[in-house]
């Protein structure tokens, strides 16, 4: 009786490992190809991103009990509605949070760390870019766990992680810069954390997958809007201390 449970836990653990691996492995590569200083800079930025992931992840978990109840009672139409609406709400909230952080990244790094680190704000933007999209995807992915479609997700996650490592190593050896490396990592994270869960979700509810993609596009559009507005506010105010930064974030 325990064997199916252990198999599922194994696949879930592998998928979680792949997610963390893609988000964190860049530190190892950067230390080897760019040096310890840049590793420390990116480590600080990634840590800030981890806080945002934790916050938005908690919001997504709030919908899990409702989805579980609907699935256990075989109310599949309700499950689809809860999934789509829940993912949209989570996507909008995380888009608002991450859009503001991205737009004000230069000021945040200046106040949080120092002016020298603030010059690497583009790195923070790339790191924050993936969070709203993957948070949306992970909420949709709860359905895959309910349907026990974790094996295919885990296998494809490992494939994406392996391809990401292979491409990164080749391009780094050819002299690829830091921003290019981070962009490749962001693409891998979005493929693994958003596109893949939705593709597997299609196996359970193919009739609603179009709506899932449309809602994701809406969240992404809102994310871009918040980012652009905050970036403009940041360019006007240029917060130099915590008080001014808080005012800037509130205005944004």
Give residue spans per PLM region.
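Helix-loop junctions and terminal segments of transmembrane helices
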Residues: 45, 50-87, 141-146
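Interfacial segments at transmembrane-helix termini and the short loops linking adjacent helices
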Residues: 36, 101-132, 179, 205
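Interhelical loop/hinge segments that connect adjacent transmembrane helices in multipass membrane
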Residues: 1-23, 66, 71-81, 202-217, ...
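Interfacial/gating helices of multi-pass transporter permease domains
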Residues: 3-12, 30-53, 78, 117-122, ...
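Membrane-interface junctions at transmembrane-helix termini in multi-pass inner-membrane proteins
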Residues: 128-160
């Amino acid at each position: 009786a325990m064997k199916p449970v252990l198999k599922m836990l194994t696949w879930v653990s592998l998928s979680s490992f792949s997610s963390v691996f893609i988000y964190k492995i860049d530190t190892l590569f950067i230390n080897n190809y760019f040096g310890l200083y840049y590793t420390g800079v990116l480590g600080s930025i990634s840590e800030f991103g981890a806080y945002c992931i934790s916050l938005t992840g908690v919001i997504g978990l709030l919908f899990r009990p409702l989805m579980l109840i609907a699935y256990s009672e075989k109310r599949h139409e309700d499950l689809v509605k809860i999934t789509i609406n829940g993912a949209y709400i989570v996507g909008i909230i995380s888009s608002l949070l991450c859009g503001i952080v991205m737009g004000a990244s230069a000021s945040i790094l200046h106040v949080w760390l120092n002016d020298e680190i603030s010059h690497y704000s583009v790195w923070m933007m790339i790191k924050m870019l993936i969070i709203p999209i993957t948070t949306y995807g992970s909420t949709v992915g709860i359905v895959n766990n309910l349907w026990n479609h974790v094996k295919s997700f885990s296998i494809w996650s490992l494939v994406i992680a392996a391809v990401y490592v292979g491409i990164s190593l080749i391009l780094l050896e050819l002299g690829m810069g830091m921003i290019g490396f981070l962009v490749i990592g962001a693409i891998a994270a979005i493929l693994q954390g958003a596109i893949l869960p939705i593709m597997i979700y299609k196996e359970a509810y193919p009739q609603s997958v179009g709506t899932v993609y449309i809602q994701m596009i809406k969240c992404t559009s809102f994310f871009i809007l918040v980012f652009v507005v905050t970036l403009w506010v940041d360019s006007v105010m240029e917060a130099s201390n915590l008080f001014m930064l808080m005012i800037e974030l509130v205005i944004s």
